Curated annotation (Swiss-Prot):
GO terms for molecular function: ATP binding; ATP hydrolysis activity; microtubule binding; microtubule motor activity; PDZ domain binding; plus-end-directed microtubule motor activity; protein kinase binding; tubulin binding. The keyword Disulfide bond does not apply. It is found in: Nucleus; Cytoplasm; Cytoplasm, Cytoskeleton, Spindle; Midbody. It comes from Homo sapiens (Human). The lineage of its organism: Eukaryota, Metazoa, Chordata, Craniata, Vertebrata. It is resistant to docetaxel anhydrous. The keyword Phosphoprotein applies. This is Kinesin-like protein KIF14.
Amino acid sequence: MSLHSTHNRNNSGDILDIPSSQNSSSLNALTHSSRLKLHLKSDMSECENDDPLLRSAGKVRDINRTYVISASRKTADMPLTPNPVGRLALQRRTTRNKESSLLVSELEDTTEKTAETRLTLQRRAKTDSAEKWKTAEIDSVKMTLNVGGETENNGVSKESRTNVRIVNNAKNSFVASSVPLDEDPQVIEMMADKKYKETFSAPSRANENVALKYSSNRPPIASLSQTEVVRSGHLTTKPTQSKLDIKVLGTGNLYHRSIGKEIAKTSNKFGSLEKRTPTKCTTEHKLTTKCSLPQLKSPAPSILKNRMSNLQVKQRPKSSFLANKQERSAENTILPEEETVVQNTSAGKDPLKVENSQVTVAVRVRPFTKREKIEKASQVVFMSGKEITVEHPDTKQVYNFIYDVSFWSFDECHPHYASQTTVYEKLAAPLLERAFEGFNTCLFAYGQTGSGKSYTMMGFSEEPGIIPRFCEDLFSQVARKQTQEVSYHIEMSFFEVYNEKIHDLLVCKDENGQRKQPLRVREHPVYGPYVEALSMNIVSSYADIQSWLELGNKQRATAATGMNDKSSRSHSVFTLVMTQTKTEFVEGEEHDHRITSRINLIDLAGSERCSTAHTNGDRLKEGVSINKSLLTLGKVISALSEQANQRSVFIPYRESVLTWLLKESLGGNSKTAMIATISPAASNIEETLSTLRYANQARLIVNIAKVNEDMNAKLIRELKAEIAKLKAAQRNSRNIDPERYRLCRQEITSLRMKLHQQERDMAEMQRVWKEKFEQAEKRKLQETKELQKAGIMFQMDNHLPNLVNLNEDPQLSEMLLYMIKEGTTTVGKYKPNSSHDIQLSGVLIADDHCTIKNFGGTVSIIPVGEAKTYVNGKHILEITVLRHGDRVILGGDHYFRFNHPVEVQKGKRPSGRDTPISEGPKDFEFAKNELLMAQRSQLEAEIKEAQLKAKEEMMQGIQIAKEMAQQELSSQKAAYESKIKALEAELREESQRKKMQEINNQKANHKIEELEKAKQHLEQEIYVNKKRLEMETLATKQALEDHSIRHARILEALETEKQKIAKEVQILQQNRNNRDKTFTVQTTWSSMKLSMMIQEANAISSKLKTYYVFGRHDISDKSSSDTSIRVRNLKLGISTFWSLEKFESKLAAMKELYESNGSNRGEDAFCDPEDEWEPDITDAPVSSLSRRRSRSLMKNRRISGCLHDIQVHPIKNLHSSHSSGLMDKSSTIYSNSAESFLPGICKELIGSSLDFFGQSYDEERTIADSLINSFLKIYNGLFAISKAHEEQDEESQDNLFSSDRAIQSLTIQTACAFEQLVVLMKHWLSDLLPCTNIARLEDELRQEVKKLGGYLQLFLQGCCLDISSMIKEAQKNAIQIVQQAVKYVGQLAVLKGSKLHFLENGNNKAASVQEEFMDAVCDGVGLGMKILLDSGLEKAKELQHELFRQCTKNEVTKEMKTNAMGLIRSLENIFAESKIKSFRRQVQEENFEYQDFKRMVNRAPEFLKLKHCLEKAIEIIISALKGCHSDINLLQTCVESIRNLASDFYSDFSVPSTSVGSYESRVTHIVHQELESLAKSLLFCFESEESPDLLKPWETYNQNTKEEHQQSKSSGIDGSKNKGVPKRVYELHGSSPAVSSEECTPSRIQWV
């Protein structure tokens, strides 16, 4: 079991390890000594491996301890039985440090020759309590404590064992036996102090291990006088078998025999405390106690209690220095101590301060509500101690649950009744103590709606909850603890999570005066998830927090005034950030360091009340959608509980905003507690059981909490440790090492420099703190003034009338108060520059809604225009006098109650217009029911009107279908008649030809004989043709008769349907006029709500100037009625239907869009790609319908439903040649000529894929190329399909996709290209570097692709329905999105350094590719290059600023800093010049071709590499300036890369040799030479700083260069030929972007 695994839970222990007065320990000396040894060894494990000079010091430190149990004899000499008097011989080492230890000061007369001093521990039994003890069965505690680096000369065997006897002195506790203080000064009394306890807590569940707890209310043991504890580094006992067996006797006998087994598995993963498992550790576990032991609390910020369970020591390899030292020393010689000071100063506090802690779970049972008492609800929840019992009323099954703490708030008369104070003291107060120690803490409340969560967390004014008590206690403790050495700074934030969106409750509008937009969650690589742009306000007193809390709660009420926005559906998160600044003195200097604690107090949303509405699943669906956070929270808790059982599972933190933000609180760095509130009533049994199971799983979560210290604390500890080393080395002059002494002094200097830098930063932060505090105060005043207009009053006048808000959530009712001043008070919509006295938000609130007049104590309300204003449920249209208690509803969703204090004082009774029911409470339910009753007739009229309109639309559809059928049959009849006429004309021609033949026969009698055979043949042919024509004529007439019969049937069926619907319409009209009771419509609150929602949707659509109209669509029959929402697009002439659930979700999106004043994603709120659109038949005359329009209307569901059983066969071409008969043609008249092209298309796609697979490596493209190719396929496919649709014949009966193989192929290719686009984009974007610009472009590209998919769906749906307007609109939007998306791809390709082969041979491609598409790609490349160069310039400025802040120690570092600054400026000039060149090429040159963009893309990786190398080189330089060791080879590599890349850029800047070009070329050459010189000088300075031997040559060089510089002033030349880097001076006339020296004049620039 490792430190981060589960601690033992104790059902009877106090929360968060509150100490028990019955517990004590007898393992302090044993476990502390072993722990101290592990700690000291782990502290130096890394530095000894890295620095061989410190290994000699490491051997002294590992062996050095103040006391060791007598090691003067070898193990073989030790007796096999313990000393009868119970003595343990301890040895105390000599020391030269007289200031570090009290024992050393008492024994100054001890000489250095004394190698050993006896020290004994004696155990005596108390005579007065002997009867209470049973026979002590002593099982020895055998454990292996192998000390690394020890040999036989230490007198300690590697298999040494310890024998510890533990007895019980009280019930259910372990008490160390008392030891009297002997007269011998070498004897130490081991007293059982209640403030120092160590206990084994009884496991509360099966399969849980026993953990050792360490508790202290005083400083840790290591910081006490050494006369109280044994600080032993070596333990010598008899060689027994390695077994840990602790047996405790007492009233509740508790046998722990599996401790060793569990501890042996432990591996401490913190602070390099990795330990090996002993070779043999056989134990067993027995639990016979009935009473559980209370857990202890350790307020000290350490992990001692976690380390107590780790009794194995990792053996350190022997060092050769230590071995040689031991060979030369005598057998019993022990090395002197050097680090007692270090132990006294730092051993008392564990610098790691990491603790494993499980989530503490508490359950609170609330009392019955008034409603439950009236209904006489039965109690099903009972409590006995910490056990909660639930009895199911139906199944009679009994459920038992045990938690850390159980609060019984059901009955105030109960002896264990838990009040608000009890809940805070037991659950929240320990969290506050842990927060002062530097841990993050979290407390969240969970339970169903109405179970008491908000009461527990916030409470009321007379009974405050956890949050107000926590804040008040926080500042009271801060006032007590704040001193000159310790100061406190506290910040707070308050936000809510509603519908997966975060709203800041402390800010009501943004900087532009608009409503604050939802915030986003980001994740920091170190500090974890955080809310971006969340306001953090500094608070200095509890009054500040009270005012901010009140403001936040009232803002929450303001946001929840809408009918659909329920506050019970949102989670509120209250966060405090406490920073403790502590001052310490090191060598007389004052240093500060900080400890930060983050406190989260969370009120989760209520769980779904689905069990009370089994018949309706809409409520449950809404809850699943809105409360996604609760569902994900359950998943996270379940996964974490499985992880606690050593299972590797995925934790879905990021599926919800709430769990993402609580990542550290659940399984991370936090001390977390949870309180689950439940109802005792039988009606809530299912929610109660669900909550208890939820809480039971949360108990298994293990957090790894650590103290949040800054770097100063670590630096101060290291500085003190180094100072202590030097003092010890000075006292021990015989073992002094000059090299080591010099290194220690150098390290102290480095640490002091770091510390001073940190202090400068902290001073700057202190100044920022003050500025933030002043800004917070100003912002609070501004928010108060703004919120007064929104009903948030902090000061109330008891004489003025007022309006108080009513809300469905009782927690938010009566939170807003609007004062009615003397005179006129105007009410209107909330706007940035609005002058209204009362400003309300909402779609149905008009700009000027109403006016309230208060004259002489009489208050009246006057509506303005058509604004919806209701008084006591009645819609008013004129001035109305308000009386005390009246209900005022504005806009349909703002509910208020009117209060008139003057009328109440005068004793006036409410007006007679109040109904008898109005004597009850005037709450939201009362006002809602009153409005519903008053508006019942209006709602009934709306519903009947909607049903009547639906019937009329159906009749209109049938009439259209009838007329369309009539047109189709008329066209068929005309076709048959024309065919008959053609056949008759052919028959007449044949008869005339026969007559002509007879005349010819008479004239040619002389040829009769010759033509006799021909005559017979012709007569036979004429007879056959005549018969054939007669048969065809007969068949045509028969077909005409059949169609006439079918036509008559169609007309008869349509007429019957028309008469049926006409009768229903007549009945509806009669019921509407006569108000017949036989036709009633049940009016419910949902109908009223739906009417308001439709009005809101139409108002939003009208104000945003969209073309969507929403209406109610009711279809009723004898059995049931179906209500849906019809959505019409007036621009495209199409309509669709939404379900009520979908309409509610879309309306929420519309509201959000309306509040944000519209955005580029506005279309998504009004339409959905999944919608099934159809042609709108409303107001569509039949005479205007073309063949294509008729074909699209036939696909309308309302029209096609009428003709479902009647099929009209199409008329085929009956033309036949003379050579073919009727039987040959009849087989093809009704055959389906369309064939399936799908297999062939798929075959071609597979072939093209194989061709791509077979391409050579030279033809490979990047992912960016593939993305652009996919966009190009979609781009061309849209144009081709749209063109084919336009060219289709208007009178064609075929669908666009039915017979055109090319269109089918294009459609499939477009769909495949989009799929490939999505897959490639996910891979490509996941590989991008983390950057603000890249992240923004990545989000925008994702959004564009999502919108493209939606418009492609609409485009194909329009093609299937033959709706031209829909096709054109979708194509236009999709083309715009494609062009914008390829711009983003071009920018990202440049920023990522990816090549674009697509631009190769761009001029040739432009002929076949759309020119707009190529221009979009090139525009993206140009923008990407601009962003890249700007980021390079910004990075150069950042590096200059960072380098400028560094201090220099000598001339070498000063020169190194100067050269580095010059190098940065040179590269900054490269970026600036490249930016100018790129812009000049794009703007000034007309022949800027695609090849230029290709070169631009190829340059991008070089700029990225140059930026990276510069950043890395400056980091190395800064590290060297700070005194840290750096890698010279890495710096050389970076500088060499910079020189090569700069050389390429300078060659690119060169121009042809002209008069101007030659001058620019010379300037470029000089600048290049300067960069080369700076690079070489920088490397030389760095080598000089890293190598101390080069200091003297550098000084010589520096002196020579100064002399040469003086000579160069007089002679004008530089004759330096000495060591070092030569200094070249170039003089140029004119201006140039170079760095000038001090001797430069305005007309001349000197280059060095």
